[in-house]
A protein has these predicted regions:
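Short, cysteine-centered beta-strand-loop-beta hairpins and adjacent loop/turn segments enriched
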Residues: 78-87
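Hydrophobic/aromatic beta-strand elements that line small-molecule binding cavities or substrate pockets
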Residues: 58-62, 90-95
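Low-complexity, intrinsically disordered terminal/linker segments enriched in charged
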Residues: 89, 103-140
Length: 140
């Protein structure tokens, strides 16, 4: 089998980075990011496994813009450990391979819930609800 195409290598790198970071290997996957964004990449995922639990990650789209640049859409399903609500966030990642291996060079939230990358969100406190049972009657 011959060498992999640029699209195949880019897709494989994106999948590896996102799946491995989902399972907690943020420090290990940081080497797959451009040095210019590495510190931001790690800090944005600092709460993963602590306050944020990533339940699933899917590559929702992939497009090569040229032989050295790719755009990847990643869908994250996640929860906060203090709130059982399942949340969804779509992230747009830009990848480049100008001098060697494919590297993540930029990412931004495209849509969905905020909080995945450590954004401060106000805790939701439910208002007290009245008792929904019928009143008790004692029959003598």
């Amino acid at each position: 089998m011959g060498p992999q195409s640029p699209a195949s290598r880019a897709s494989e790198a994106a999948r590896e980075l996102n799946v491995n970071s989902r399972f907690g290997d943020v420090a290990g996957t940081a080497t797959m990011t451009s040095p210019n964004v590495r510190a931001q990449y790690v800090s944005r995922r600092a709460e993963w496994g602590k306050l944020v639990r990533v339940v699933d990650v899917d590559l929702g789209g992939f497009q090569m813009t040229d032989s050295e640049h790719a755009t990847v859409i990643v869908d994250f399903q996640w929860t906060r450990v203090d709130d059982g609500t399942l949340r969804n966030t779509r992230v747009l990642q830009e990848w480049a391979s100008t001098e060697g291996p494919w590297m993540l060079v930029r990412e931004r939230r495209q849509s969905g819930d905020i909080g995945l990358f450590g954004e401060v969100i106000a805790p939701t406190t439910a208002a007290p609800r009245p008792d929904v049972q019928f009143p008790t009657r004692v029959i003598n």
